[in-house]
UniProtKB/Swiss-Prot annotation:
It catalyses: (2S)-2-hydroxy-3-oxobutyl phosphate + 5-amino-6-(D-ribitylamino)uracil = 6,7-dimethyl-8-(1-D-ribityl)lumazine + phosphate + 2 H2O + H(+). InterPro entries: LS, LS/RS, LS/RS_sf. This is 6,7-dimethyl-8-ribityllumazine synthase. The keyword Transferase applies. The lineage of its organism: Bacteria, Pseudomonadati, Pseudomonadota, Gammaproteobacteria, Alteromonadales. 5-amino-6-(D-ribitylamino)uracil binds at residues 22, 57-59, 81-83, 114.
Amino acid sequence: MNVVQGNIESKNAKVAIVVSRFNSFVVESLLEGAVDTLKRFGQVADENITVIRVPGAVELPLAARRVAASGKFDGIIALGAVIRGGTPHFDFVAGECNKGLAQVALEFDLPVSFGVLTTDTIEQAIERSGTKAGNKGGEAALGLLEMVNVLQELEQQLQD
């Protein structure tokens, strides 16, 4: 039986992190968690990490698409925080962001890790950005590192 699975270490991986500035009090902690994870667990060098800042979560897919189209990166981490308010705006922003990022991954055959918090309250967002519920930016980075490795391993298996 052949089993294809990745590991976390990706010393030579080139990673783009597309970051929403909206709700920056939460998103900056997600970014810190992602970068720390890439460096400590993935052994990714500083020069192989590029941070791209965009206004909000709706802009994440377009920036991710441009990054993917460049062919210069092994994967993309998208970070943001969409916090529910009193209008249906939350549903549109969260849904379109998720759908757009998934489309980029499929269109360019490139791992795109979804590190966009979608929470009902500010407290939930803070908990998920490095306090009670861990750091979802770091978790997104772990997922990306594994997928970069899985796809490389799968490519080798399919060529044999």
